[in-house]
Each structure stands twice: as C-alpha cells, then as structure tokens.
C-alpha cells in the first residue's frame, strides 16, 4: 500500500509540473528537435510522434513521404518530436497515467517498456497487423513488447549478437576463424593469438552488462523469469561470469575493457589501433566501427557467436525500441495503419537497413536484392553480413525485461564487475548472490 501511495503521489506532483511547464502533445517547446513532414498537403491528418532517438525520425520522414504518394486520399502530416531519453519516457508515462497529453505514436526503449504494461496498458494492440505476418519475423523481438497475447510495440531491429573478428590479427596468428564453433574453441584460438601476436583475443567490459547478458541469453538463461522473478544468481549465470573471469586471469587471453565499456572513447582508440582480435556485440554495433574505428575498414569479419556447446545457440537479441500507438490518439485506424506501413511492411524493413543500418526483424527480406547492394557496411565488414543473420535467425532466445532491469544493469556496473573482475574480492557466486539479495530487497519495498 505504501508503495502505491508514493507512486501516485509522485505522479500527482509530476503532472502538476508538466502542466506548469505546458507539457502536451500539442506543444513541442521542450523538444530537442521537431520535424514536420507533410505540412504542404492540404487536408492532411496530423499525427504526433515522440522519440528519444533522432535517427529514428529519418525512417518516419521517409515513410510519410512514401505514404502520402501511395495514399493521396489519406494524407498524413507528421510532427516528430525528439526529446532526451529520460524526459521522453517520464513524460509519456505520466501523460498516459493522467489521461491526456500523450502523442499518437511513440518510441519506447525496451528496458522501459515494462513500465507501460503495468495494469491495463494505455496502448493500442497491433495484433491485426502483426499476426498475419509474425511467422516472417524473429518472433522473440515482438514478445518483448507484448502482454497477454497482445502485441503493443513494433520492434526496430533484431539486435542479433555476433562476433567481430580482426582478420589481420587472426591471420597473423594462423587461426582459421571459421573453425571457431564453441567457446572452448574460442579460448584455444585466443591462446594462439596471444602467443603469436602479443595481442589480446578480447576485452571484458566492467561498466556495461550487455556483453555478458548476450552470453547468458545464449545459454537459455536470463536475469528474470517470465513471471518477473529475479534469477540473477542461477548456476548458468554464475558460470558465465566465471568464464569472463577466466578469460582474463586463468587463460590470460583478455584484458579489462579500456574505459569500462565498448562505447568508451578509450576503447574505440584501443580497438582502432589493432590491439584486440575480436569482440562480441549486436549487429547494430557496426555503426560504432564506421563512426569511431575507421582504420579497421576492410579488416573486420562478422561471424556467429561461438556456441556454449556443439549445436547450441550462436546469437542473442539485445537492445531494442518498440514503437506504439497510444490510446489517446483521435485517429486510431490511421495511426495503426501508418505504423504498420512504416515498420512492419516489407518495404519498411528494407528501409530499416538502407536508412538506419539496422538488422530488420522481418527476416524474409534479408535476401532481397536491396540487401545485396554495395554500401559502407559491406565495404567495412565484407559481404556475408546477412548470410550470418540468416544462419542464426532461429537461434535467438526471448529475454525477459522487467521494470527492475535498470537496477540489474546498475548492480553489474557498480558492484558485481568491480568485486569480481576489477578488485577480485568476490567469487562470481558470492557477487551474484549478494546482488540478488540487494535487488530483491528493493523489489519488495
């Protein structure tokens, strides 16, 4: 009862703040950037779209132009407003709770999505558009944004995890990359890399839990079960953390990641200088190479993750954004039809690749001609990108995201990785059990 009182008190205060600030879907004064598409068309219906990722607007701008050409009798004027991450999610949740001020369409990041599924979701289900084609998608990505059989969010990418290999280093070490099928093979290859090149096989992040999370998902484990119970200290998770520890201190083929995470400037420079033979991250990390590690162009090769055992899964689905239609829209049919056009159709999934460089969740387009056309990604990584994705498309487990997922991520960065990998004061089992107790105590408050 106390928690509910505090929550609704908080909502009440924040609604007052929003009203005082003029927060409304009809006002873009607080937006970092506002784009209006279709305002030159007489009689166009206005739809308001909120996002926290400016690059996502590019996809919707293109979709509006195409929509208005294809459906001149149902023209759309899209007002796309980009806000800071926390501000957008907080304002959207409060607008939905209060019953007014929400946009027609909105992006919701995967770790925040559970907050919008509490109680009766104030979002409109997209089943009429999703169910006829879901067999053509990586279904696990839709499950992230679903509740009780209703699909509320439309995914933006698969986020398939892969291994990025530096071919130059691997060739110097005499390692055949395609011979690496399991993590045991990976360790043996790493020993050869260290011995023959003096470089490390990989680095282990201490300020980002995603690289470990993808390995956990590969094993069929998770940090929460389907009922929202915390499962941080399972034997599988303990063994994954032990494996990361062993890469550094037992096998001596890895180092702690410079800067703590694969998005740090220190890491970009270290990787760009050719000091690391491989790294595991989702396919969307390709853009980080292009933007921050230009000297590796033509040297990197993408392959499936090594499996934990022969025949095991070789990928995981990490990160994501679900786009929704809110129940406050005055144009339900148009908003849902447009969202399906912009993110579910074949053409839309081709645009996710050509405009954003994302691996589209609709796998049946991956061998379409547009995916074979030369671009910066193929020049950087070679021509096998979608061959790899097609190879692993059925090897991606669903993951369970909770409103407490940010607490898990924070616990890894502040305590678990510090105690196990940096300071080496706790075993993986001790650190994970301690974190389990800490987070469970917070969940019960």
Curated annotation (Swiss-Prot):
Assigned keywords, A-Z: Cell membrane, Lipoprotein, Membrane, Palmitate, Signal, Sugar transport, Transport
Pfam family, one: SBP_bac_1
Positions where lipid (S-diacylglycerol cysteine) attaches: 21
Keyword Membrane appears in the UniProt entry: yes
Compartment list: Cell membrane
Signal peptide: 1-20
A GO term from the CC aspect: plasma membrane
Predominant cellular place of this UniProt entry's protein: membrane
Lipid addition sites, N-palmitoyl cysteine: 21
Role description: Part of the ABC transporter complex AraNPQ involved in the uptake of arabinooligosaccharides. AraN captures the substrate and delivers it to the two transmembrane components.
Assembly and interaction partners: The complex is composed of two ATP-binding proteins (MsmX), two transmembrane proteins (AraP and AraQ) and a solute-binding protein (AraN).
Official protein name in the record: Arabinooligosaccharide-binding protein
Species of the source: Halalkalibacterium halodurans (strain ATCC BAA-125 / DSM 18197 / FERM 7344 / JCM 9153 / C-125)
Gene designation: araN
């Amino acid at each position: 009862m106390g928690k509910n009182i505090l929550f609704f008190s908080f909502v009440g205060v924040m609604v007052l703040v929003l009203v005082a600030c003029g927060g409304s879907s009809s006002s873009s004064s607080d937006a970092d950037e506002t784009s209006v598409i279709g305002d030159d068309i007489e009689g166009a219906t206005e739809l308001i779209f909120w996002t926290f990722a400016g690059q996502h607007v590019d996809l919707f701008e293109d979709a509006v132009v195409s929509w208005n050409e294809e459906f001149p009798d149902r023209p759309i004027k899209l007002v796309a407003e980009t806000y800071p991450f926390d501000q957008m999610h907080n304002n959207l949740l409060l607008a939905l709770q209060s019953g007014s001020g929400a946009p027609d369409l909105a992006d919701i990041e995967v770790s925040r999505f559970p907050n919008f599924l509490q109680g009766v979701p104030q979002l409109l289900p997209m089943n009429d558009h999703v169910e006829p084609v879901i067999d053509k998608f990586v279904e696990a990505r839709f499950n992230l944004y679903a509740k009780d059989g209703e699909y509320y969010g439309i995914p933006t990418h698969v986020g398939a995890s892969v291994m990025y290999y530096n071919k130059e280093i691997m060739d110097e070490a005499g390692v055949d990359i395609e011979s690496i099928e399991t993590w045991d093979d990976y360790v043996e290859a790493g020993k050869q890399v260290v011995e023959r090149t003096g470089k490390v096989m990989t680095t282990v992040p201490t300020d980002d839990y995603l690289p470990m999370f993808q390995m956990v998902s590969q094993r069929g484990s998770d940090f929460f079960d389907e009922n929202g119970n915390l499962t941080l200290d399972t034997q599988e998770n303990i063994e994954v953390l032990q494996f990361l520890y062993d890469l550094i201190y037992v096998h001596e083929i890895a180092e702690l990641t410079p800067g703590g995470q694969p998005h740090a400037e220190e890491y970009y420079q270290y990787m760009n200088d050719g000091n690391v033979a491989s790294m595991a991250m989702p396919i969307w990390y390709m853009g980080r190479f292009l933007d921050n590690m230009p000297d590796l162009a033509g040297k990197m090769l993408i392959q499936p993750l090594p499996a934990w055992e022969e025949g095991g899964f070789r990928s995981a689905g990490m990160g994501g954004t679900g786009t929704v239609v809110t129940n406050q829209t005055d144009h339900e049919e148009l908003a849902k039809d447009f969202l399906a056009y912009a993110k579910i159709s074949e053409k839309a999934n081709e645009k996710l690749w050509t405009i954003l460089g994302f691996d589209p969740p609709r796998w049946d387009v991956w061998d379409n001609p547009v995916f074979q056309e030369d671009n910066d990604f193929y020049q950087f990584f070679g021509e096998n990108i979608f061959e790899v994705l097609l190879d692993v498309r059925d090897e991606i487990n669903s993951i369970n995201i909770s409103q407490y997922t940010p607490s898990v991520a924070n616990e890894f960065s502040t305590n678990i990785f510090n105690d196990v990998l940096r300071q080496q004061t706790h075993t993986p089992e001790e650190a994970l059990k301690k974190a389990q107790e800490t987070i469970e105590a917070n969940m019960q408050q």
